Every structure is written in C-alpha cells, then in structure tokens.
Amino acid sequence: MKNKLLFKIFLSLSLALSVYSINDKIIEVSNTSLAADVKNFTDLDEATKWGNKLIKQAKYSSDDKIALYEYTKDSSKINGPLRLAGGDINKLDSTTQDKVRRLDSSISKSTTPESVYVYRLLNLDYLTSIVGFTNEDLYKLQQTNNGQYDENLVRKLNNVMNSRIYREDGYSSTQLVSGAAVGGRPIELRLELPKGTKAAYLNSKDLTAYYGQQEVLLPRGTEYAVGSVELSNDKKKIIITAIVFKK
C-alpha cells in the first residue's frame, strides 16, 4: 500500500514537471496488473448496485438527463468538435458550448466513493497517436498470427507508453465491467479512478440510449498515466493499465 501511495504521489508531481518524466523506481512499482485495494467488478449485478448509488448521489435534473441521454446517442457530435478545438470550448459554436457546460455540470454531480477500475475498449487506430510507435510498427502489429499479437511489438509499445501521460480532449466513455459492451476491439484501456473522481454512471434507461453497457462517463480533458502495456494470456488482447488524475 505504501509503494502504491508513493507511485500516485510521483505521478501527481510528474504532471506539473513533465509529461514524460517519472522516476524509474516508480515505473517498476507500476507494473502490477491489478491493485488489490482497488474495486474491480466482475459481476453485473454488483456493478449495477454500486453504480446506482452514484445516480442517487447525483440527483440529476430533467435537463441533466436529457443532456446525458442525447450524448450517448451520438457522442461524436460533442467529442468531434472538442478534439478539433484541442479541448478549448471557446472555439465551439454557442449551441455546442451550452451542451458541453451542461455535461460538465452533470458529470460533476457524482464522485467515486472508493478507487475503482473502469475499462475502455479501443481499436488499433488508437495507437496512431502514440509517439514512438511508428506506422510500420502498427502495420506489423495488425498482421496477427491467428488473432495473436506479436509480443515484441507489444513490448515496444510498453516501452514507449510506460509512465507517459495522455489526455483525452473529449469525454471518455468507459465500462464498469470488463467486456460488458460490444467486443471486437483488441485494446482494453484499464483505468484506475482514485477515490473522489468525478464520474457519471449511465446504466439507466433515462440516462443512456444503450442500456446494459455499464457505461461510466468521465469528464472531458481526462488525463491518465500509463503503468504497463501487456498481452492477455491468449495474446489476443492488448491491455493498457493506467491511473487517472482526479479532476
């Protein structure tokens, strides 16, 4: 527990100093796959009970519910402009700005009561934004052996991503249970949310157009530091483990 706390302290300091520098000793600590003191849901019923407490905490207004529901119908209408604007809402049209502010307000109404893992399924295009992992590397990675990914390329991916900080200018849709949503995306981004992280649990029919996906929506501009990149046991999934900076 002491080492994990030390890891989090160094990550927080690194955000202010540099997006690339984290002490080598801390990197070694970060290579654990799942921390024992972080909630990790595998049962849908338990996840739903936990998530419903966040909904109760939020006390959403009717306008909040409409904003969240409309977002889930087509998140690209909000996230697309946000990403093009580099997260600067002043560059958006007034209508989109209003929607963003409403979403910001809605998400801020509930926070995680404890540290918890959430998951985001990604396709390989995600790796095009990773500095140090070339287009040639990506092409080679796509040439799987019966669906199994090359260990050496994943090891290189770990080397270039480990201890680096990444930012999502849009909102981040995640799942409370691994694999709860539609599969087919070979990258699993496993995010640790520290206690007190702003997050909206949307698995309610009046909050999402896709009930059953166990969606947890994170604020726009979410930043996370990568601790490890590794293959699943069957080598068919690339697992990126990271910790989110609490907003």
From Swiss-Prot:
Its EC number is 2.4.2.-. GO terms for cellular component: extracellular region. The keyword Methyltransferase does not apply. It is an enzyme of class 2 (transferase). Coiled coil: none annotated. Inhibits terminal differentiation of cultured mouse keratinocytes. In culture, also inhibits the differentiation of human keratinocytes. Probable ADP-ribosyltransferase. This is Epidermal cell differentiation inhibitor. It comes from Staphylococcus aureus.
